[in-house]
Amino acid sequence: MKSSHLQNLLLRRDKKAAEVLLQRLGKDENWSAVSLIDEMLPGLLFEANLTYGNFHQVKMALYLRRLIRENKLSRRSELTVLELLIEETLRRSWVNIEAGEIALAEKAENPLTAMLGELAENNLHNAFYYALQAYQEKPEELQDLLLCLGGVYGPENLGHSLSCFFPVLEEIVNSHNPAAETAILSYLSYLNRYDIPADFSPEDYQKTDMPENSLRLAASGQGIVNLHHMITLVTYWLWEKADFHDKNFPLPYRIYYQKRLADKGISSKRLKRVKEPLQVEVPGSYEEFRQSFNYDNIDHTTRLIRALWQDSQRKAWDWVCRLYAEDYEPGTWNPHFFTGIYLAFRLNEENLSDDKSGKEMAIDQAVEYYLNSVNY
């Protein structure tokens, strides 16, 4: 990692220095949350031992980075989520690896084919070499192929090989962020655990007839597995809209549908709740929202969040992210709290589906998961 005060204190795991830094940020307005998150990225991209089995920390950081970049969080909320990110990073295990752009001595005629051949042999070094060539020559094709590999092997890891890395590509690789090459190396290191054939063909995994009720199916059920059904489907839809996505590139929906939705039913209780009148008063301030947020009343609080979203998307982004961050407890925090609500909100904000009830169900599902899981 390149030298900076934040990076150095993270490398030293200096909790005292981190506390001093956060205190200073609380008194000074002249700081950029996006820049501070960027300083953390090399470490977050190479988390080791994977506390939650996958790269949730960098995903959560990039979701929050995007919201901050788009001015959707207040300054108070920015500081609160930074406190959470720094505290979590200090608690995690990660390795100090950083990659960068290089001038290539030899080039393959087709670097993507060469990369797949090396992955088939579990030769990470060579796979990364050809991935760098592809990133220089055809970055959009590289990103589609990497995500397709993640999607195909997603059922083996609850979809994390797609959902954890989509924001990495969207926010880091596609924008040619200084951490882009490190991000590509991290993704290849993750994919290298799977038996990827040298003749891998995206066309073998496409499905062009996803059912109209896919969102309602994905947003049904409780618990972490069912939440991931929604997370993965929304990630697919964001991928379809991504700047780097070639509209002719087939997405591996067949694997997702067969493994996740084919034998699943729609939650009648959740569908009924989102179709009923909200009948909840929208708070006028964050303090009132905090008081109205009832951790023991799922029916009330899911309606509260949906009512807040309908009243003001800006307030919903800001207040929910702040409340979740304020609820942070070291050792018990689950990054899926942010992942679930972020993707449910973004599904609605970008109108990724015409299914109004399905979109409401996604918010309901994410909030219910939080209420059932948070240690409060």
Regions picked out by a protein language model, each given a short descriptive name:
Residues M1-Y376:
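Mature, well-folded catalytic/scaffold domains that follow N-terminal targeting or propeptide regions
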